[in-house]
């Protein structure tokens, strides 16, 4: 999503499925299922015995180390046999969560968010809902044309657009596993135009196309295991959380956000939306953040789940030549006039 003030957490930026998510939404998808704050331990017999000391004794026992070696070998084999390539970016990532489970979680999350927003959602026949649906479906159609995309991930999905008409909410947009799309009217001034809306929607769509929800779920047991190992060294799970967040969870989240920026830019270009508008969107986002943070603390990127807007602008500028190439190869010059005339009706 986005930044803290805004899921693009999809585009929001948190400090965990975007812009910033409304404070009341605690579920973060693209970016990020987090079920606990780390492993916890219970001491017995007035501290004479602990899981920490027990785990250390296992490490020191020769026969136990053999079993640990076998366990490590099995886990390594499982890891390497579940490596997958992300579409468009071609990044290798570890995913073991099944597609049905991913869709089930998306459906559960949708019901929860629907209950919170249903009073503000515009009807499907509203002009703004129709406009955003048309933009989004052009992005989906463009994804089908990308040779690196597994079309089976898109087949059979019933895409539903929900425009949340709440100007006071934090600017936000996100796409859930299973095809449920939410975009808040408060983000539209930052989008400014159709190409800006496409920038936001393509980013959020990219999170689901790349299965970032499943990737986050797949990493959760690894983080728990590492937390257990760290506990044998630090003896304090608060320190474990700081280490895991600073060196693993947050960098991984920023990596997925950056990947969604890249995939989204390439797909929106293939859909004949102006790729250079993505830079302007993030410039407006950066200005919005400055206004919201006036007199506040400095937002440090390494403490955030999302890249800084300035870094996203740098990335977009670096990727723009390739995006322009895709735009030209998609015969967008002739399609552009038709598209503009269609939406001016």
UniProtKB/Swiss-Prot annotation:
Q: Which cofactor does it need?
A: Zn(2+)
GO cellular component annotations of the record: mitochondrial inner membrane; mitochondrion
- What membrane topology was assigned to this protein in its record? Single-pass membrane protein
UniProt keyword list: Disulfide bond, Hydrolase, Membrane, Metal-binding, Metalloprotease, Mitochondrion, Mitochondrion inner membrane, Protease, Thioester bond, Transmembrane, Transmembrane helix, Zinc
Subcellular localization:
Mitochondrion inner membrane
Q: Any note on cofactor binding?
A: Binds 1 zinc ion per subunit.
Spell out the InterPro entries in the cross-references. Mito/Outer_Membr_Metalloprot, Peptidase_M48
Annotated GO molecular function terms are: metal ion binding; metalloendopeptidase activity
Q: Topology: which residues are Mitochondrial matrix? A: 1-67
Q: Which GO terms describe its biological process?
A: mitochondrial protein catabolic process; mitochondrial protein processing; mitochondrial protein quality control; mitochondrial respiratory chain complex assembly; protein quality control for misfolded or incompletely synthesized proteins; TOR signaling
User: What is the protein's given name?
Assistant: Mitochondrial metalloendopeptidase OMA1
What species is given as this protein's source? Saccharomyces cerevisiae (strain ATCC 204508 / S288c)
Taxonomy-wise, where does this protein's organism fall, top ranks first? Eukaryota, Fungi, Dikarya, Ascomycota, Saccharomycotina
